[in-house]
Amino acid sequence: MVQVVAALVWKDDKFMICQRPLTKTRALQWEFVGGKVEQGESLAQALNRECIEEIGVGVEVGEVFAEVDHVYPDITIHLTLFNARLSGGEPKMLEHNDIRFITPSEIPQYEFCPADKDILEKIVSEFGGKE
């Protein structure tokens, strides 16, 4: 099982989502910024590194928001999603096709990676009424 970390980044009442590039599996599906944990890294170190690589901005890693295991045809992952804040600057599209900030009510308008399904339901249940 591959350890994966991701960031739940809020800006006011909207959270950040990133669209996977055409060149990767699950092309053009939406996801949270993040990636695989490398050997010797803590989860927080991995998340900060992935954010710098993918969006050009580091993050202040907060508490765990959700954890989920998911089996894809090509990989089995354990995804840990952390509450996080951008540590300076605006996100840039260094690896993704697009970056957006959306409200929980806008989730149905986007095709997310299947591993994010339960996490998105938790976001709606905890934050959906605050719009």
What are these regions (language model features)?
Residues 83, 92-123:
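NUDIX/MutT-family hydrolases
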Residues 9-10, 17, 86, 101:
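Conserved hydrophobic "DFG−1" position in protein kinase catalytic cores
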Residues 124-131:
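Generic C-terminal helix-cap and adjacent flexible tail
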Residues 32-64, 103:
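The catalytic Nudix box helix
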Residues 24-29:
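A conserved beta-turn-beta hairpin within the catalytic core of GNAT-like acetyltransferases
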Residues 1-16, 36:
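Conserved N-terminal beta-strand and adjoining loop/helix that marks the start
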Residues 58, 66-90, 100, 123:
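Active-site-adjacent beta-strand/loop module that shapes the phosphate/pyrophosphate-binding cleft
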